[in-house]
Amino acid sequence: MTTEAKCPFNHAVVGTGTTNRDWWPKQLRVDLLSQHSSKSNPLDPSFNYADAFKHLDLQALKQDLHALMTDSQDWWPADFGHYGPLFVRMAWHSAGTYRIGDGRGGGGRGQQRFAPLNSWPDNVSLDKARRLLWPIKQKYGQAISWADLMILTGNVALESMGLKTFGFAGGREDTWEPDQDLYWGRETKWLGGDERYSRGSPGVDEAHGVLVKDDDSQVPHTRDLENPLAAVQMGLIYVNPEGPDGNPDPIASARDIRDTFARMAMNDEETVALIAGGHTFGKTHGAGPADYVGAEPEAGELESQGFGWHNRYGSGKGADTITSGLEVTWTTTPAQWSNDYFDHLFGFEWELSKSPAGAHQWVAKNADAIIPDAHDASRKHRPTMLTTDLALRFDPAYEAISRRFQQHPEQFADAFARAWFKLTHRDMGPRARYLGADVPAEELVWQDPVPAVDHALVDAQDAAALKQTILASGLSVAHLVSTAWASASTFRGSDKRGGANGARIRLAPQKEWQANQPEQLAKVLATLERIQADFNAAQSGGKKISLADLVVLAGNAAVEHAAQAAGHQVTVPFAPGRTDASQEQTDVESFAVLEPVADGFRNFAKRRYAVPAEALLIDKAQLLTLTAPELTVLVGGLRVLGANVGDSKHGVFTSRPGVLSNDFFANLLDMRTEWKATSEAKEVFEGRDRSTGELRWTGTRVDLVFGSNSILRAVAEVYASADAQEKFVHDFVAAWTKVMQLDRFDLA
C-alpha cells in the first residue's frame, strides 16, 4: 500500500468539499444568528472588558504611542520620519466602513484584522500599521482591545502632529472572527461596481491597489447606489480617489462623495473637514506599476505570517512603496497640522497628470517644487492633488465651506476634530458605553442623548400597582404588547442605536411610522400618559415613572396577563431607569433610517421587496442580537398575542388570541393542514384541512418559514411538543425581556 493510499483524508480536510451553500445558494442564513459565539473567544468567560479598560494606565499607553510615532523601523520606514499619517489612515479605514443604513461596519469590533477588510485593495499596507502596533498591544494585553487601540492610535497620531482632538472613548470589544452578517455587495471582482449600480465598473481580475484600468472609466456609473452600501466599488472604503470608476471628473466625484459620506451620517461641512483634515497629513504611494505588488494577506503564503502585498519594485518600501497607485503629497507640512491644504487647493491651477503607476492625479501648473520628499531631504516636488480633492474646489457647496475654512483656520481645526470624533465613535452607541478619562463632556445630538435620571425610581410595589392600573385601563393585550415591541425593537446591535430608552416612539419621526400604526399608537400613548401623570402627581419624595419605563412596564403587564390566561404565573423582569428624550434631543433625519421597512415579528412589510421576507426577518433578528431559538419563540408568542400590524390574522394560528400559548407551533406543524400560495407572488398562503378543504389559517412567508426551514423547524418542534407549554412561556419571557433591555447599557 502506498503512503498516499494510507492517508485517511485523501487530500480532503474537515470543512472542505461541496457545502450546503454550494448546493442551495439561496439557503436561508440562520447561521448568522450564531456568529461570534463563546466558542471563538479565547478569553475567560469571566473576563469583563469594561473593567479591564478601567484599570488601564491610559496616559502611559498614550506616551508609548507618542514614542512610536517617530520610531521608524527599517522593515517599514516612516514617511517624513513620522508614522502619524499611516496610523490616521488605519483608524480612518477601521471606522470608515460604517454605514447608517443598517448601522453595520465601523471600528467597534476590530474587524480590520479579518477578511475581507484585511485584504481590501483600499487597505494595502495597513497590515504594516497593525504590526507596528503589536509590541504595544502585546505590552498592555487585554486591557486594551485591538478595536480601541486602532482608534486611539489615530487620535494620538493627530495629537502628535499638532491637532487638538475632541476626545476619545474606549469601550469597543474585540470579536474573534470575521463578521458574516455584513453585506459588502454582490460583485465578484475587486473594484467592481456593476452590481451596486445599475451600470458600473466591472472590476479587475487582480487588484492589489485602488488603481482602475482607464478603459473601465469611459462610462461613469449611474447614481443609484444600492442600499445599505456606502462605498462606490467593492474593496473601497468610500470613493475612488481617481474619480468615478477612475474617470478624473471633479464634479462627478463630488456627487459620489456627497452620497457616500451622507450614507455614513456626515453632512457637507463634516465631509469637507474630514477630507481636508485627513489630506493635510502624509502622502499616497504609487512609486511604480501595480503589477509589482503581490497577493493580499488572505491569499498569502504561511511564511508571510499575515503580511500581504509583497512589493517587488526596488526596495519594496520607503520611496519604492506602492499602495494605491497614486503618488500625491498635499502639503508642505505632511507631519504637522496646518492650513496648507486649502492654500494649495485654491492657490494653484491644476492640470491632469499620471502617477508613476499610471493613475490619474493632478499637479499644480507652473509651480515650484515646494513639497518635501518622504525619504530624501534633498528632494522637493511640485504640489499634487487627487480628483476627490478638486471636488472640494469645483462643487459650489463644498467650495464655499472650503473657502471659509481657509479664511478661518480655527473653524477648520474644530470642525475636523469634531468630525473625526464622530467618524470614530458613530458606531459606539450612547454615551453610557463610553469609557476613559478622555471622554468629552459635551453632549452631541448624533449620540441620541437621553436625560440623566433625576428622580427616585419606582419599586416593585409601585410596578405591581401600575400594572393593575394599566390592565384596568381598557387597553388590550395586543395593543400593549405591540406598543412596547415597537418602542424597544428599533434597537440595532450594529451601532447600538434605538431601543425603548428615551420614549422616542412618541416623537417624530417614530410616531408617524407606518409599522407603528400612528392612530392606534396615539390612543395607547394618551392612556399611558394619563396613568403616568396620575401616578407621578400622587408621589412624594420626587418619585416618578418615565413614559419610556411605563411603555415597557405596560408590555410586561400584558405578557403576564396572557401567561396567566394560559395557566402560568410569571413575573416579567422590569428594571426602571429609562428617561424621556425631547424632540430637540432627537435628530429626525438620523432616526429616519431606523424605520422598519419590514418587521416579521409583527408580520409587517411596507411593500414587496426583492429580498425574501424570511431573509429580512433574519436580518432584523440579527440586528436585535437574537439567537435562532429566541427568534422562534418571539415570533410564536407575538403571533398569539395579536401583535401583527393592522390586526392582521396572518400567522395567528390559535383560537384563543391574547393567551400566551404554544398554539402557533402546534398548529403550524399539524399535518392535517395543507398549505398553498394564494398567488404567484407566494407572499400569502392558505392552510386548508387536507380532508375537507376547509380554510383553517392564513400565513405569510415569515410564518411558514418555521415549518419550511429545517433549522427553524427543529426549534419549532421543541415548542410544539406536548411538554413545551411551560418552557415556551418562560423562554418567551426571557427573550422579551432581552429585547426590552437591549439599550440598557447602564444595567451592565
UniProtKB/Swiss-Prot annotation:
Post-translational modification as stated in the protein's UniProt record: Formation of the three residue Trp-Tyr-Met cross-link is important for the catalase, but not the peroxidase activity of the enzyme.
Enzyme Commission number, as recorded: 1.11.1.21
One BP annotation, GO: hydrogen peroxide catabolic process
Keyword Metal-binding among record annotations: yes
Enzyme class: oxidoreductase
Keywords: Heme, Hydrogen peroxide, Iron, Metal-binding, Oxidoreductase, Peroxidase
Cofactor(s) demanded: heme b
Ligand binding (heme b): 279
Gene3D superfamilies given in the database record: 1.10.520.10, Peroxidase, domain 2 (1.10.420.10)
Role played: Bifunctional enzyme with both catalase and broad-spectrum peroxidase activity.
Complex formation: Homodimer or homotetramer.
Membership in a protein family: Belongs to the peroxidase family. Peroxidase/catalase subfamily.
Name the UniProt record assigns to this protein: Catalase-peroxidase
UniProt lineage: Bacteria, Pseudomonadati, Pseudomonadota, Gammaproteobacteria, Lysobacterales
Gene field: katG
